[in-house]
Amino acid sequence: MSNNIYKIVSLYSFFSFQENSIIELKENLFSIEKNNDLSGLLIIAREGLNGTVCAEEGIIENILKLIKNIVGNNKLNIKVSYSKKKIFKKLKIKIKDEIVTMGVPEINPSEDSGTYIDSFSWNKLIKDKNTIVVDTRNHYEVSIGSFKKSINPNTENFSEFPEWVDDNLGKYIGDDDSKNIAMFCTGGIRCEKATSLLKKKGYKNIFHLQGGILKYLEDMSKEESLFEGECFVFDKRVALDHELKQGSYSICHACGMPISIEDQKNKEYREGIQCHFCVNKFSDNDRKRFEERQKQINKLKDKNQKVYKD
C-alpha cells in the first residue's frame, strides 16, 4: 500500500466498558489486522477506550462501525488526519485499569465532567481576563507548542497532575469563585478527565476544549489560531504543524525528548546517542549501547530498509 494514503483516526470515549465487550473488540480487531494493513495503539479499560488506528479508508470505516456498536449512545470523540507513511509498526491493544492514567479511581468522567467548548468559542473564552488556561499535557509536549499565556504544570506524566492541582491551582484562583478554568490537551481525553477531577474537588466554571488541540487546528485558520508552535503526538510523526502535517521535530532515541532542527545542530547532539536534554543523564555504558543500536540502524538504512524504534 505504499502508493496509497493512510487514514489516521485518533479516538476516545468514556463509558462503562463491559469485560465481554472488551474481549470481543480485541479479537475482532486482531482478526482484521491478519488480512489487512492495519496498525495503531488502542488502550481499553472499564472506563472506556482511547487510541489511534491507521489503515486505508475502507478498513478504518469497518473499525469505526465495530467501535460505535460498542460505545452506543456515548460520545465517541474522533480526529482524522492522513499520512503517506504508516505511523505505527503494528497494531497493539493494551487492557489497563485506566484509558489515561491519573490514579484517582473515585472519579468518573462519563458521569461528571466539565463543559465542552468548541474550537470557535475557545478563542473568546481564553481571551477573557477572568479565565485561567491550563495545559494538562506533559512538560516535553508543552515545550514545542501551546496556547498563548497558558499555565504549564510541568508534569512528567499525567498521574502527577492531581498533586499539581492540590499544590498550585488555588494560587491562580484565589478567593474568586467566578474565575473560569479552561483546560486543554492533545485530543481531549486528558483535559476531560482533568475536569472530572476538579469537579470532584469542588471547583466551578470548568471548561475543556472539545477534541483538543488536534480538532482546534483542524477547525481554525492559521490567521485566527491562538496556538503557537507544533503539537506533539505519540507516534512516528512526533509533531504536527497547523495544517496537521508532519512537523519539524524528531525524537531523541536516548531520552525520548522532541528535538528541533536547531537542536540537532547543537555540539552535544549525537544521533541516537544523546541530545542536550540528556547529555548528563546516562552512563558511559548506556551510551555504548545506544551507539551500537544506532550503528545497526544506519546499516539497515543503507540497505534501504525501513527501521522504526518500537
From Swiss-Prot:
Q: Molecular function (GO) terms listed? A: oxidoreductase activity, acting on paired donors, with incorporation or reduction of molecular oxygen
Catalysed reactions, as listed in the record: uridine(34) in tRNA + AH2 + O2 = 5-hydroxyuridine(34) in tRNA + A + H2O
Q: CDD domains from the xrefs? A: RHOD_YceA
Keywords for this protein: Oxidoreductase, tRNA processing
Q: List the disulfide bonds.
A: none
Q: Name one Pfam family in it.
A: UPF0176_N
PROSITE patterns to which the protein is assigned, alphabetical: RHODANESE_3
Q: Biological process (GO) annotations?
A: tRNA modification
Q: What is its EC number?
A: 1.14.-.-
| Keyword presence, Oxidoreductase | yes
Residues of the Rhodanese domain: 127-225
Its protein name is tRNA uridine(34) hydroxylase
Q: Which organism was this protein described from?
A: Prochlorococcus marinus subsp. pastoris (strain CCMP1986 / NIES-2087 / MED4)
Q: What is the lineage of its organism?
A: Bacteria, Bacillati, Cyanobacteriota, Cyanophyceae, Synechococcales
